Amino acid sequence: QYTEFGRQHNFKDVRLLDDFKQRVPVSEYEDLKPYIQRMMDGEDNILWNTPIRWFAKSSGTTSAKSKFIPISDESLKDGHYKASKDVITMYYIRNPESELLTGKSLVLGGSHQINMVNEEIQFGDLSAVVLQNSPFWSSWMRTPDLSIALMDEWEEKIEKLATSTINENVTSMAGVPTWTLVLLKRILEITGKDTISEVWPNLELYLHGGVSFVPYREQFEKIIGKPIAYLESYN
């Protein structure tokens, strides 16, 4: 009710779900685009009542053009980062003897280039926004270094990912299956090992998402060389 969108739709009078349904029509991206553009121009209190300084750029799968999704501090803290804690908690409930937090998580996202709209507003892939704003304590458990994780040139990135992580105690991995397989194969080439479990003997969890894991599961089981847990996540 403290935003322009809220005032236009009388949010102050909303008490029940039916009130909201009556006042707010189903909106597509094109309906919200003018509001989002104003937010990208630096205006506050348009769709959200705290400053928005980050936008996630979609891949444009439903139209020819990419979409820009406002990312608030609240959505990062109470959504993405809270969900990460929930996943770890649920994993430990199922696996109370886990040694997951004794090592590091190898995080492999998509293209991570960060772009500036102006001095205050930035945009990038969601994975880039989440990594760039991640709480300080997450760096204790994550590999590689953020400067490598945020690289945009994939061939160089895979090489640096491989060389910088082969001597780490990696206990979990997170990323899309396609690029993760490319990385794991490169690590075996560099080390001369037959399986990833020889490189990272304490690896116990792979968090995957983005595409169906069914076509990749057998390849992962073979290249890792020992049973581990597989969990699908989506944000």
List where the protein language model places each region:
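Nucleotide 5′-phosphate-binding alpha/beta core
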Residues: 1-57, 63-205, 214-218
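Conserved AMP-binding/adenylate-forming
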Residues: 201-235
